[in-house]
Amino acid sequence: GSAWALQHPQWMLDARGKAKQEDWTKDGEHDSYLFNLGNPEACRWMSKYIGDFLEENGIDYYRQDFNIEPEGFWAANDEPGRQGICEIRYIEGLYSFWEYLLNRFPGLLVDNCASGGRRIDLESISRSAPMWRTDYSYGEPIGYQCHTYGLNLYLPLHGTGTVSADKFTFRSSLGTSIIYNWKITEAGQSIYDMRDRQAEFKELRPYFYEDYYPLSGINNITSENIWLAYQLYRPSDDSGYIVAFRRKDNPDKSYTVNLSGLHPDHTYILTNKDTGEAIKKTGKELANGFTLTLDNPQSSLII
């Protein structure tokens, strides 16, 4: 009964009972449609409609989510012997839609969400950025560390949330974007800690746009008994950070890493952001091995 479904029924995909949307039924019948971006006429109309809306309202940040199961809509509309074509045409239309917006608004950010990180493919990320990268257990730090550790290898722009202002949890969510979900009115919460974490994020954020080096290998990175560490390096001014985590079951107070990208003959000052301790090392020394120290499990450091 929506306006678009009544005005343009030919642009709607009907799942004909095959979509996995049990809550979207009425009298036993499926009661929803999927707007068909695979229809060129529909795609052009939607592109202009959203583009006009952005222009009229001065919007420069466009976020698109997709919290339904589209497979049933696509499968129900495939022609015999043409399995997958409806999906292919739809995704081609989606890319065309985003390209229209980016061509019309060159400074636009397209924030791409699909049930959390389900569209982190090369074609999508060439047109958009997943500022909510996953619906994985919200605030669980080990998973978040692993997401950052892997995605940074090829995807500078991605983000997630944080529910706690403690250093270990917050630093697990570092990236180019963080959504703060702090309960500032709850007992025991510290506004000062929150402000410190925000300042730390703003300080490190620009470094995620340049060089990245994982420092602790790729084996068993989900385990609770390891150290996980990575390096952010900015060749533009020869500066950077080390971010490291000692997980709760790790027995070792120290861990040695080999830094990359540094000039062998340059001298670098390394300052522990938590203790203020500073030392000097050459790039060659840092490449040959630098030892990180954390006295307690479930702790972190930034240098």
Language-model-detected regions and their locations in the chain:
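Alpha-helix capping and helix-loop boundary segments enriched in small/acidic/polar residues
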Residues: Y33-L37, E41, G81-E92
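Active-site-adjacent "subsite" loops/lids of carbohydrate-active enzymes
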Residues: G1-D52, E56
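Active-site groove signature of glycoside hydrolases
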Residues: W45-E79
